[in-house]
């Protein structure tokens, strides 16, 4: 804490996190998501597992032709029913290419193939099984990361692909005349090389377009939080790779479900630290949190009504005119033995500031005190303004960011009185009790529900870190795909 995942899933890890990327833009993001090389390495491991399964589905065509034996003439051969038994991808790597995207490289891959063969020369028929190994396979693919400005979704395409094969070896079984294969071995090896190099890139390209891109489209760019607000996590620019990272600039902004309008302030530029030891990072600007305050305050959702039955029974403080009459005599005189009610609301949007030393919140609340008359109607007593300085403790739970407010300082001001003049200092001790013991626990209960982090599906986070910086909170984590 600070003061402050099936085929498509695994393959998607090659790029889903890679899509956490940034671009030069005139609009600062509310959130910057970053994947480090450590994260890319893990994503590559997971993605290659799925690519391996897809490559093992390659269908190999039958090969047939003629051969010639000296003094005996021509014969026919056929290689058929060939099935891939295993596709080994031992050395794989994915790296960011500055201003381009991602470079996927696989080296020293190999294939084990089993099939049948037959040969015929007049009345002589030969045949059997064969095992074939393809070794020294290399695959190079470029992945282009972009975005759809209209929807804010990230996009991915295979911009280039090439593959090569060093060696093809055939082992024949089932006939003592298997040496005949040597007559057309080179022809078979050449045909197989051409077929496999083409099909490998077809699989890579089709996997990107048929699995990755649709998967990307399922990632929500907006999240509805409640009846009042949602969060916009859309991209504000195409993904961009740098030498060591991939960044993604997200709008990172709360918005009103009833009437969306831009906040009257802009996000600051975020200066990410260069040292990273986690797979992914989220730089969450104070702008993100302040748009939350702006939306909820404008919607009139930041309010609370306090009655005496909400006060702990063991408390000496009571919301009655009798108790308040001790502090303000005219309350008891004008409204003897009555219940009271406090209506508290935010008169201004709360303002959060982030610094390396921690997170601070300025909250201005108005409190209207009422006497509850025998007919249950309300009679106004006085109106207070409360200026609160609060510390914000931020943490993470699962895929959500949670928070807690702690009171540092509270100043009272009497804005209006319906019962005549009185010293506001007489209420300071009461408000000092009400705020941390009754009001803040209600707010903190809601804050413990948290805000959803902009993460793809099936991702579990661990080794979490949270560190405040100037204008933003840096959230770091390692990733596991379930």
Curated annotation (Swiss-Prot):
Protein name: Bactericidal permeability-increasing protein
Keyword terms, alphabetized: Antibiotic, Antimicrobial, Disulfide bond, Glycoprotein, Immunity, Innate immunity, Membrane, Secreted, Signal
Domain of life: Eukaryota
Lineage, broadest ranks: Eukaryota, Metazoa, Chordata, Craniata, Vertebrata
Comment text on domains: The N-terminal region may be exposed to the interior of the granule, whereas the C-terminal portion may be embedded in the membrane. During phagocytosis and degranulation, proteases may be released and activated and cleave BPI at the junction of the N- and C-terminal portions of the molecule, providing controlled release of the N-terminal antibacterial fragment when bacteria are ingested.
Keyword Cell membrane annotated: no
UniProt xrefs under SUPFAM superfamilies: Bactericidal permeability-increasing protein, BPI
Gene3D superfamilies found in the cross-reference section: Bactericidal permeability-increasing protein, domain 1, Bactericidal permeability-increasing protein, domain 2
Signal peptide residue numbers: 1-26
GO terms classed as biological process: defense response to Gram-negative bacterium; innate immune response; lipopolysaccharide-mediated signaling pathway; negative regulation of interleukin-6 production; negative regulation of interleukin-8 production; negative regulation of macrophage activation; negative regulation of tumor necrosis factor production
Keyword Ubl conjugation: no
Gene: BPI
Cross-referenced PANTHER family: BACTERICIDAL PERMEABILITY-INCREASING BPI PROTEIN-RELATED, BACTERICIDAL PERMEABILITY-INCREASING PROTEIN
Gene Ontology CC annotation, any one: membrane
Region called Central sheet, part 2, residue ranges: 221-285
Family of the protein in this entry: Belongs to the BPI/LBP/Plunc superfamily. BPI/LBP family.
List of glycosylated residues: 62, 303, 375, 389, 463
Subunit relationships: Monomer. Homodimer; disulfide-linked.
Main location group: secreted
Species of the source: Bos taurus
Chain residue ranges for the region called Central sheet, part 3: 463-482
Record GO terms (molecular function): lipopolysaccharide binding
Protein role: The cytotoxic action of BPI is limited to many species of Gram-negative bacteria; this specificity may be explained by a strong affinity of the very basic N-terminal half for the negatively charged lipopolysaccharides that are unique to the Gram-negative bacterial outer envelope.
Stretches for region Cleavage sites for elastase: 235-240
Tissue localization of expression: Restricted to cells of the myeloid series.
